[in-house]
Amino acid sequence: MVTNGYDYTTSFLESYVNAFGKDPSNINNVFKFSRTWYNELARRNSDPSYEKWRVNNRNVYEYFGNTNWYDVFYKDYTTGHQHNISVTGGGDVASYYVSGRMFEQDGIYNAGDEKYQQFNVKAKGIVNVKPWLRVENTTDFMYRYSPQPTSNTGISTTPMTVSRMLNHQAYPVALVTNPDGTWTEAAVYTGWAGFVEGNSWRKDRKFDMNNRTAVTIDLLK
């Protein structure tokens, strides 16, 4: 993964010029590009003592960063815990088995409280109706819950997932915040700003149920 802003921009520029025969006006559709800015990026890349931002003559922030957006979003590790319980019983005529599982994993992001939770219940019963007739029924339930950050940017009427916007708007050359503490466009468009502030996310819930019934007839009894 390329996290050096100059290397990333140079590769993008070469690809764009080879494809279209001219310089781009933007990197993708948001981040402004010009040769003047690119030359300044090269100068600041060669001397780490320079700031990774400046205010241009239009009083607009320009960025010259080396941001690893995956480090911004994701934790290095996470933890989880699982609990299981089962009950079984019965006799010659009928028997049963019931099990339950609860799994919870801490969030993978550096912001928000998006723990993943999953609950499973399985129940199985067997009834020997006759020596030659057996009926079995098995039912499974599974419930999953996970909140996820999203990006509401105006680019699409549908909120975009973080993974999509990281590919689209997380330029290494961009910074996360401005010197005055405000969010950069990249932080807003990737969804990071909204997720940190708690106003841009979705809750994914899914419930599954399966039921299976089997009848066994032994014609030899």
Show which residues each predicted segment covers.
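C-terminal beta-signal and adjacent terminal beta-strands/loops
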Residues: 2-3, 72-74
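Surface-exposed loop/interface segments of Gram-negative outer-membrane beta-barrel transport/assembly proteins
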Residues: 1-66, 103, 107-210
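Outer-membrane beta-barrel transmembrane strands
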Residues: 75-95, 101, 193-221
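Aromatic side chains
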Residues: 96-97, 119
